[in-house]
Amino acid sequence: MSGYSAEQRAAMQCMSLARHGLPHALADCGLPHVHLKIGEGIVTRRALLISTVLGSCVSVTFFSRRLQLAGIFHAMLPVITQSYRPCNEPCRFVDSAIEAVYGNFEKRGLHPEEVEVKLFGGAFSMGLREEHPDRCMIDVGGRNVLTAREVLAAKGLEIRSEQVQGTRGRKLLFNTRTGEVWVKLLNNAANQLARRQEEQARAQSARGCSLD
């Protein structure tokens, strides 16, 4: 949108969001929009509208009303491996992502009951029926959700709401000013795109990381 003023870009962004049925509480033209990619996390006190697209990946949102502090990550695998620890990319993995993002809340002296936690994602996109004997072995989304629940519970964090699993991916929009999250289930084309992006990211992780 080069060539447009900041006000014009904000207005066009607002119209684009409105066309997708975004609730008025989230379609605030004054909020800068940030897209969260696989393996990324954000902790901020700025008012932002953060979007991300999930297939088998999961996101957890954290929000403190008292401090107006918000956090979110987009993790693709349940548990960080030893070979990946030195790479300084904790938000690729559910367990280390929770440690990294929630750690910023702990450093500010927040107690678990002061933090609103919501869980999203973990879809199963391989096309196997629930009773298929191999499903539990390749259900990365299910294992992501299970790990998130276990790690959050171990930290005394209650999940206030969640929308997880199923066979369709999700688009999220997280308002860091209010803690609200808007969720839209993906259509088949978007589902396939999200699946391909996650498969490419997992293949990259399987090769390890460079410490150059």
Curated annotation (Swiss-Prot):
Pfam families in UniProt: CheD
Catalytic activity from the UniProt record: L-glutaminyl-[protein] + H2O = L-glutamyl-[protein] + NH4(+)
Superkingdom of the organism of origin: Bacteria
Database matches in CDD domains: CheD
InterPro entries from the UniProt entry: CheD-like_sf (IPR038592), Chemorcpt_Glu_NH3ase_CheD (IPR005659), Cytotoxic_necrot_fac-like_cat (IPR011324)
E.C. code: 3.5.1.44
Keyword Hydrolase: yes
Keyword terms of this UniProt record: Chemotaxis, Hydrolase
Family: Belongs to the CheD family.
Protein's UniProt name: Probable chemoreceptor glutamine deamidase CheD
Organism, scientific name: Oleidesulfovibrio alaskensis (strain ATCC BAA-1058 / DSM 17464 / G20) (Desulfovibrio alaskensis)
